[in-house]
């Protein structure tokens, strides 16, 4: 069984800022989903909330009466969240599946599924916690990623991902557990993270390919992530 680097403290050694640099664009995309689907949640929960920065960014741009509750099993992440918490935003060191009475209008599950040893069991445990679940995952599986020797192994070592998805396998995993897909869209993650000459060179062919066929671009060149709203 893989060692849980989030609990042992190994993860923060590799990612000391706990992905806070991704928080603004993630929060913006969450708001985009809410607007697209005419949702106005009053209580938002997040599984694997990390430092709580996504919730804080959401709070800054949403109804001031909205409440936010985050859960994480990593002590270091919750410690970092202390400066972001306030009267309407709380983060707990806890496994949400073991929290009595946990229920929300919207549950955020952002970059979590790929870390679950048994993600089907995890999906089943999320069903009763909220009528709406918003997922995000990086689409690591692409032809380009597979052809580059050691690419996926390196990502697993850095991010502790246990599973890698395409759009098709991710959506099918949700359907296998009786989730109803309400909305989904790609996000050009590579543009947000473009650094270094090789990554920047790939931006133009990705954009051209994506404009012609988004599914083909994601499968061939990668560099995209996926947001999915489900019931």
Language model features with spans:
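Conserved N-terminal segment of class I S-adenosyl-L-methionine
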Residues: 1-103, 110, 120-123, 157-168, ...
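Glycine/Thr-rich phosphate-binding loops of Rossmann-like dinucleotide-binding domains
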Residues: 117, 143-144, 192
């Amino acid at each position: 069984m893989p060692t849980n680097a989030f609990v042992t403290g190994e993860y923060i050694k590799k990612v000391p800022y706990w992905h806070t640099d991704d928080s603004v664009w993630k929060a913006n995309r969450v708001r985009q989903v809410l607007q697209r689907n005419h949702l106005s949640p009053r209580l938002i929960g997040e599984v694997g909330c990390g430092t709580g920065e996504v919730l804080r960014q959401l709070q800054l741009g949403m109804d001031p009466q909205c409440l936010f509750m985050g859960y994480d099993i990593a002590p270091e992440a919750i410690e970092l969240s202390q400066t972001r918490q306030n009267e309407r935003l709380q983060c707990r060191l806890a496994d949400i599946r073991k929290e009595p009475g946990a229920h929300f209008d919207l549950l955020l599950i952002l970059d979590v599924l790929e870390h679950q040893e048994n993600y089907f069991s995890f999906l089943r445990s999320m069903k009763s916690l909220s009528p709406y679940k918003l997922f995000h995952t990086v689409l690591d599986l692409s032809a380009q990623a597979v052809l580059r020797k050691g690419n996926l192994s390196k990502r697993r070592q850095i991010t502790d991902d246990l599973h890698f998805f395409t759009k098709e396998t991710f959506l099918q995993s949700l359907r296998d557990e009786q989730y109803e897909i309400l909305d989904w869209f790609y996000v050009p993650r590579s543009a947000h993270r473009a650094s270094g000459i090789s990554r920047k060179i790939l931006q133009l062919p990705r954009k051209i390919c994506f404009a012609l066929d988004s599914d083909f671009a994601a499968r061939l060149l990668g560099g995209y992530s996926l947001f999915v709203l489900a019931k």
